[in-house]
Amino acid sequence: MLRTIILKAGSNASIPSLSRQNKLLRFFATAGAVSRTSPGSIKKIFDDNSYWRNINGQDANNSKISQYLFKKNKTGLFKNPYLTSPDGLRKFSQVSLQQAQELLDKMRNDFSESGKLTYIMNLDRLSDTLCRVIDLCEFIRSTHPDDAFVRAAQDCHEQMFEFMNVLNTDVSLCNMLKSVLNNPEVSSKLSAEELKVGKILLDDFEKSGIYMNPDVREKFIQLSQEISLVGQEFINHTDYPGSNSVKIPCKDLDNSKVSTFLLKQLNKDVKGQNYKVPTFGYAAYALLKSCENEMVRKKLWTALHSCSDKQVKRLSHLIKLRAILANLMHKTSYAEYQLEGKMAKNPKDVQDFILTLMNNTIEKTANELKFIAELKAKDLKKPLTTNTDEILKLVRPWDRDYYTGKYFQLNPSNSPSAKEISYYFTLGNVIQGLSDLFQQIYGIRLEPAITDEGETWSPDVRRLNVISEEEGIIGIIYCDLFERNGKTSNPAHFTVCCSRQIYPSETDFSTIQVGENPDGTYFQLPVISLVCNFSPILIASKKSLCFLQLSEVETLFHEMGHAMHSMLGRTHMQNISGTRCATDFVELPSILMEHFAKDIRILTKIGKHYGTGETIQADMLQRFMKSTNFLQNCETYSQAKMAMLDQSFHDEKIISDIDNFDVVENYQALERRLKVLVDDQSNWCGRFGHLFGYGATYYSYLFDRTIASKIWYALFEDDPYSRKNGDKFKKHLLKWGGLKDPWKCIADVLECPMLEKGGSDAMEFIAQSHKS
């Protein structure tokens, strides 16, 4: 099966001929590196926009000499010459489709021993051809500022996704794969990677109903296509509240001790009896923090967390389509269907994991919320309580911001503000700090590169080459980190092109960028894009800087964790390279990076004041972090609630009563059952975008967080810059991509053999370990 998550196997390719080498060399890191003689070059390209525009040839006023020195070639997005326009994207998609068809025809008609030995390799190449269009289109439609490009990406994605689904139900391809894997004379000559990829693709064929009758296979294709379209519609509307404003009676707000300055900024309705509080911007959130009237807060909070009825229908349709698809595949639920091949192999183990985590956390959560309960009880003139159930019953989600603010007014802290801290963490400081960290623990650095004309989709995008001290360039990261209208609002790591081996028979490298292995063979450079929405602030005439709050530093570290997995998981086959691994394993490297982002030793090395250059003091950081970490267990429990909601929306009850299933009713009933910060007022489930991308697997974040915590304490707590332990993590986990069983990777890193086989005991061990 040709998935959108794929990689290569195999025998060592022979060293190319001299003529081929000359052709290849044109594509090696062709963007010129910024001179490394300037020590702050990474910091400077992110913190000094004038410098960046000048060296990148974007400044119309730069000198003739500068224009000559930095003369730029013309190309398309990601140095793909087709991608200069929306029509070029369509052309690239058509050419890729033609190449896929030619490779397919060759595979169908080659029954020789050589054809069998290269069959899995060619399946992987076929996958790569399709995924380089599908992944590219997923990126463009989420990020590109040109609507015409976005529309073209949507069209190409639909076309290629449908073609891929047809191949996933192709009986002849599946039968040939089975014959290769079941023939000892052939399989004994295949590499471990080829066998792994072959098994993965065979499992995916079977998940597509390959053994069922043609009508069922056709239905599978139709359902998969519809799920993709409905899911994209759903995700496109998760940022929008149900209405643009909410009406609050003037008499209620005027008597709620809200600042008159804030009230004067609010419009009123025609009769002048109600304030119209917008559900966008800062006003509603400011009111949640300052309004003493609980009914007003409740109304505001509900409006901010609700969506339109149309969006609820999209979610309901998505959930029901998935249930129908799972039923078609003879599974009791979509969760059962989706969890095949994951670390947590079945819904029961997942739900047991979540419940264990909740049981271990609920008392701590109630204890964290006790200060809110005490303040609210005092306002309501009710007796104080220490009973967990009573505390949780009293404290509602619209109380959190108001009473937290009130608590700190009554108990002033000497901790610095988030704004004061952010002055030490410019975007350039943080990227430079990440490069320094990777250099010390992995022997890898980030090197800025000048881009060719047309290579990026916005002048704000920076290119970083990823350089290994042993191998040279091993990958490329395009950083689209500054806020811009039209971008996805969520931070994201997009795989644009996976790493894989380049084979001697391949001669056209015009649409990819190529690297060289130590043995002289060549590989497709992994290309990824990191997307965030950080806001620059004007600090002087024509000069702005991007100051990151510590939560944003953590976000950037998280996404760079994914990036390092993509760069270091350089297998021969693209089906298992980098982040092409089990969904409940893929977040582990990124969440581990969050531990680095919270470590005082790391932060004091990175934090330099933008004006004075002074290093941030450890005491200053400790005081600030203490003041912001007081609801940690609440956050864990909230994540567990979302994971349980995801399981609830994909369990066996959906198909049994599909006509009557109500997503909002189900959501609110679950909220009441799980007790903490109960939301039985909004339809927030329609704003939960991860229900599409992480359907039945949202538990992965919590699961990987508990594992990452154990790895941090085992390897890096004593020394976050340990090269020995960085190499250990790279050697036993990162370098394998999706080739090695995740449980085996974790067992090797932790030196804990009992985890190797996974299963319910291993899941229980991980869940219980969260208590520490």
From Swiss-Prot:
GO cellular component terms? mitochondrial matrix
Q: Recall the GO molecular function terms of this protein's record.
A: metal ion binding; metalloendopeptidase activity
Could you confirm whether the keyword Glycosyltransferase appears in this record? no
GO BP term (any one): peptide metabolic process
* Enzymatic class: hydrolase
Reading the lineage from the top rank, the first entry is: Eukaryota
How is the cofactor bound, in the record's words? Answer: Binds 1 zinc ion.
Residue numbers annotated as active site? 559
InterPro entries in the record? M3A_MIP, MetalloPept_cat_dom_sf, Neurolysin/TOP_dom2, Pept_M3A_M3B, Pept_M3A_M3B_dom
Activity regulation, short description:
Stimulated by Fe(2+).
Q: Which cysteines are joined by disulfide bonds?
A: none
Q: What is its main location?
A: mitochondrion
Biological role: Cleaves proteins, imported into the mitochondrion, to their mature size. While most mitochondrial precursor proteins are processed to the mature form in one step by mitochondrial processing peptidase (MPP), the sequential cleavage by MIP of an octapeptide after initial processing by MPP is a required step for a subgroup of nuclear-encoded precursor proteins destined for the matrix or the inner membrane.
Q: Supply the name of the protein.
A: Mitochondrial intermediate peptidase
Q: Which organism is it from?
A: Saccharomyces cerevisiae (strain YJM789) (Baker's yeast)
